[in-house]
């Protein structure tokens, strides 16, 4: 199938780097199965000043959908769809293909059926926060998300300290989890007890483990590192941190999509990953199935 006749998989991106990686990974896998070209729709970033397209430095291989924000007709169509119980996905101007809106947080088997129609363009919208959406294409995803060519010289200098079997990346998510009441109500920051139990488990298997603490709150990371017998580390950007954490031999992650990817991008099949059982705040956990966010070999605490 030549490029001119190939179908298009269009991914509607939103959120920060971690969210965008999940969305792009689902799109990459679907496009690969369909022999399709991958495109990304950036319209949702145009009216949100806090977030922007974060994947440009990576070799994702996606083209950007042309055009501006959805017009009046697209907005009315989305509102009508939402009123009828749909997800209210705004079609970008010029889109005439199918639309697949993720129906819920846990894995949706219907996603696999999208590749059955090899001739039809499809737009996907959602979070897609499970490795099951790109099962069998993990190597492709890791190759397209390889940040080694985009990180700073500072990160490369830090990388030398992470070499060896003893390195442990510990990630603490703060930011909006503690400063934004709405984000706190959905996610909730983890307690120190989780990290202490995780580090006890790590040190039981690796007594000489070297602990490196990463966070979007460097001062807090330094304080924790001092208490935990480790050291804080920070790259010059979020992409630096993602890459540096992926180099470590063991991973203690936060309840964060960004944190998730820092562990998943470590390609070693025997890498130890400890993840929190509390993926969301209690009220959100009560109504959300989260089992599919964890790869089978990850340890939950």
Where are the regions a protein language model picked out?
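A short beta-strand-loop structural module common to alpha/beta enzyme folds
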Residues: 36-47
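Leloir-type glycosyltransferase catalytic cores
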Residues: 281-301
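Short beta-strand segments
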Residues: 40-42, 169-173, 210-215, 275
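Short catalytic/ligand-binding loop motif for oxyanion handling, primarily in non-cytosolic enzymes
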Residues: 19, 47-51, 132-133, 177-180, ...
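A short, glycine/small-residue-rich beta-strand->loop->alpha-helix junction that serves as a flexible
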Residues: 13-22
């Amino acid at each position: 199938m030549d490029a001119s006749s190939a179908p298009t998989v269009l991914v509607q991106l939103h959120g920060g780097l971690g969210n965008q990686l999940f969305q792009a990974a689902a799109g990459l896998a679907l496009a690969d199965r369909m022999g399709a070209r991958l495109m990304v729709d950036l319209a949702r970033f145009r009216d949100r000043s806090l977030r922007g397209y974060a994947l440009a430095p990576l070799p994702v291989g996606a083209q950007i959908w042309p055009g501006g924000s959805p017009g009046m007709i697209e907005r009315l169509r989305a509102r009508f769809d939402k009123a009828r119980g749909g997800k209210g996905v705004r079609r970008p101007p010029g889109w005439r293909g199918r639309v697949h809106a993720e129906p819920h947080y846990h894995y949706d088997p219907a996603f696999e059926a999208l590749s059955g129609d090899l001739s039809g363009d499809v737009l996907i919208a959602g979070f897609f926060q499970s490795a099951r959406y790109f099962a069998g294409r993990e190597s492709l995803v890791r190759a397209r998300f390889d940040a080694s060519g985009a990180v700073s010289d500072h990160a490369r200098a830090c990388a030398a300290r992470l070499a060896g079997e003893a390195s442990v990346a510990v990630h603490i998510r703060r930011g909006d989890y503690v400063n934004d009441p709405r984000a706190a109500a959905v996610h909730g920051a983890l307690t120190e007890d989780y990290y202490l139990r995780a580090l006890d488990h790590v040190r039981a298997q690796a007594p000489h483990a070297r602990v490196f603490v990463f966070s979007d709150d460097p001062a807090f990371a330094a304080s924790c590192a001092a208490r935990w017998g480790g050291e804080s580390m920070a790259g010059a950007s979020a992409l630096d941190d993602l890459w540096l954490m992926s180099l470590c031999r063991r991973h203690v992650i936060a309840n964060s999509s960004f944190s998730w990817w820092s562990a998943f991008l470590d390609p070693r099949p025997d890498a130890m990953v400890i993840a929190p059982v509390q993926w969301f705040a209690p009220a959100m956990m009560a109504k959300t199935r989260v089992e599919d966010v964890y790869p089978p070999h990850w340890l939950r605490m």
